[in-house]
């Protein structure tokens, strides 16, 4: 959620809300899978965007991902994880066996723990792009 859907002040764009509504109209089930322990904040954002949610997910561990299947009754092959953090969102999604999309963070301001991880993500991504070719 943080830096993927909303900025560090927990605000989102009108376009995001419209996109979420369009996806729902096409019968796509939407979940926020957040490591945030702030259930009230996650619940508020999810409610405003018309999404289901799981907070305190402990990504990259698999419990949160499994909860999505339990709550949605959707097969793993129909799930996609979209996130801005390589070592939580993407690694967890890949370990769980779902498709993943790594996006750029919305804001430059990040939580302390995320700031610590970003240099290591850059090392991994640099090696990946060197091997596979950069996609922009």
Region locations from a protein language model:
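Short, charged, surface-exposed secondary-structure boundary motifs
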Residues: 57, 61-67, 110-116
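Residue-level recognition of short loop/turn positions
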Residues: 1-2, 92
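Substrate-recognition element of Asp-dependent hydrolases with the DxDx(T/V) motif
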Residues: 4-12, 16-46, 56-59
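Short, structured coil segments at secondary-structure junctions
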Residues: 48-50, 96-97
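Acidic, Mg2+-coordinating phosphoryl-transfer loop and its flanking beta/alpha structural elements
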Residues: 82, 87-119
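Conserved Lys-Pro-Asp/Glu-containing loop-to-beta segment of HAD-superfamily phosphomonoesterases
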Residues: 61-86
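C-terminal cap/substrate-recognition subdomain and adjoining C-terminal extension
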Residues: 74-76, 95, 110-136
